[in-house]
From Swiss-Prot:
It comes from Simian immunodeficiency virus (isolate EK505) (SIV-cpz). The lineage of its organism: Viruses, Riboviria, Pararnavirae, Artverviricota, Revtraviricetes. Residues 40-44 are annotated as: Interaction with host APOBEC3G. It comes from the Viruses. Keywords: AIDS, Host cell membrane, Host cytoplasm, Host membrane, Host-virus interaction, Membrane, Metal-binding, Phosphoprotein, RNA-binding, Ubl conjugation, Ubl conjugation pathway, Virion, Zinc. Its main location: host cell. Residues 14-17, 74-79 are annotated as: Interaction with host APOBEC3F. The modification Phosphothreonine is found at residues 96, 188. This is Virion infectivity factor.
Length: 192
């Protein structure tokens, strides 16, 4: 019998991102209770020695499974150390890989309160509204002018600790362009 290969998309991440992600998920499962119904599977509970953790997030009849891996091939940089993340959407026997942005949108849709378009009308009528989104990683689009005005009026409040974002987990913070802190003066006087 010949070998059968299965190909899947795995995002390379550094190990500190994986540790932070797991800590945030556990905090919101057990302390803040915002992640109700989520299931965390440890590395010793799986048959695959490459899996470091699995998080099962129910989405109605379907579920989102976020698997973190260790011991993969060495990464492009020394700090990657062969760590990776795969994101899978499952419903019945159907499975498909999805990207981090879509995963964040699905989590946002099912689990967290958000400012909706009808909230502008509710605010104008004097009814109470939810003026903020609990999970802003779930939608990146620019809001309407009314939404932006209401946000400016209410103000943005930071959450501690933040809610776990799949996009934040998979982003490559090491290969982003460096921001120059001081633009005053010429480059020659700043020693650049």
């Amino acid at each position: 019998m010949e070998n059968r290969w299965q190909v899947m998309v795995v995002w390379q991440v550094d190990r500190m991102r994986v540790r932070t992600w797991n800590s945030l998920v556990k905090h919101h499962m057990y302390v803040s209770k915002k992640a109700r119904g989520w299931f965390y599977r440890h590395h010793y509970e799986t048959d695959n020695p490459k899996i470091s953790s699995e998080i099962h997030i129910p989405l109605g009849e379907a579920k989102l499974v976020i698997v973190t891996y260790w011991g993969l091939m060495p990464g492009e940089r020394p700090w990657h150390l062969g760590h990776g993340v795969s994101i899978e959407w499952r419903q019945g026997i159907y499975r498909t890989q999805i990207d981090p942005e879509l995963a964040d949108k699905l989590i946002h849709l099912y689990y967290f309160d958000c400012f909706t378009a009808s909230a502008i009308r509710q605010a104008v009528l004097g009814r109470p509204v939810i003026p903020k989104c609990e999970y802003p990683a779930g939608h990146k689009q620019v809001g309407s002018l009314q939404y932006l005005a209401l946000i400016a009026w209410v103000g943005v409040q930071k959450r501690r600790p933040p809610l776990p974002s799949v996009t934040k987990l998979t982003e490559d913070r090491w290969n982003r362009h460096q921001k120059i802190k001081d633009h005053r003066g010429s480059h020659t006087t700043n020693g650049l």
